[in-house]
Amino acid sequence: MRPLQAEIIKALGVQATIDPETEVRRSVDFLKAYLKKNTFLKTYVLGISGGQDSSLAGALTEKAMQEMRAETGDDAYQFIAVRLPYGEQADEADAMAAIDFMHADVVKRVNIKPSVDAMVAAVEADGSKISDFNKGNIKARMRMIAQYAIAGNNAGAVIGTDHAAEAVTGFYTKFGDGGADLTPLYRLDKRQGAALLKVLGAPAHLYEKAPTADLEDNRPALPDEVALGVKYKDIDDYLEGKDVTDQAAETIEKWYQKTAHKRHLPITVFDNFWK
């Protein structure tokens, strides 16, 4: 095993093998424990894209809320699923299928296009130009603004979908989809997340669909693997301590080092990870 590989595995808490049912219970208990400790909270809010990660996080969250209602008799415990399209979403059917699978208690829809376009126009008012990539990050951050607005109105906390295969590459928008209160998938790689969905009875297309951030107008539905230059199979193998090609390992490690700032709170004078 490569030296940095061992360090990364430890830092992200990845196990080489898992029992999916045990990990489902671990995540559900984690979500419930946070509510029991923070009794002012009554809802969890999650943006739903129709991909594997939000499908799994949503299913785990709904299960936690069902158990909280059963255990406490308090029907105020609710899971709020939020659709956050930029105008019309090409894979809207996938998102609605995910919501149907997880049986969300409440479903809301917020079209972020007017807000995103207004922000782009405001920044460009001085003659500068927002790149398509930068605009994609604005979309991700606007989605999180909407989720926190909904959470604030409903005594809620925001659920994130970050997992080990995403964390190792930093493949998320800082203070966008990377900003949340709780991340129940953290420690799981991509194939492990799919294994949890299988035991939860998810339709296969929810975990077989090619992962995409789908943030760029000029490159819609760009597959994650194309953007990263490495396949999730190799990322998962790497995180599980298996051998991968030097090229795959070097690509993963390059992303890990380049995106270290995303895995830290705002940098202070006491931090030295970046030096």
From Swiss-Prot:
Pathway: Cofactor biosynthesis; NAD(+) biosynthesis; NAD(+) from deamido-NAD(+) (ammonia route): step 1/1. GO terms for cellular component: cytoplasm. One of its GO terms (molecular function) is NAD+ synthase (glutamine-hydrolyzing) activity. Its EC number is 6.3.1.5. It is an enzyme of class 6 (ligase). The keyword Transport does not apply. Catalyzes the ATP-dependent amidation of deamido-NAD to form NAD. Uses ammonia as a nitrogen source. It comes from Lacticaseibacillus paracasei (strain ATCC 334 / BCRC 17002 / CCUG 31169 / CIP 107868 / KCTC 3260 / NRRL B-441). The keyword Nucleotide-binding applies. The gene is nadE. This is NH(3)-dependent NAD(+) synthetase. Mg(2+) binds at D53, E166. Deamido-NAD(+) binds at R141, K174, D181, H261, K262. NCBIfam families: nadE, PRK00768.1. ATP binds at G47, I48, S49, G50, G51, Q52, D53, S54, T161, K190, T212. Keywords: ATP-binding, Ligase, Magnesium, Metal-binding, NAD, Nucleotide-binding. Homodimer. GO terms for biological process: NAD biosynthetic process. PANTHER family: NH 3 /GLUTAMINE-DEPENDENT NAD + SYNTHETASE, NH(3)-DEPENDENT NAD(+) SYNTHETASE. It catalyses: deamido-NAD(+) + NH4(+) + ATP = AMP + diphosphate + NAD(+) + H(+). Belongs to the NAD synthetase family.
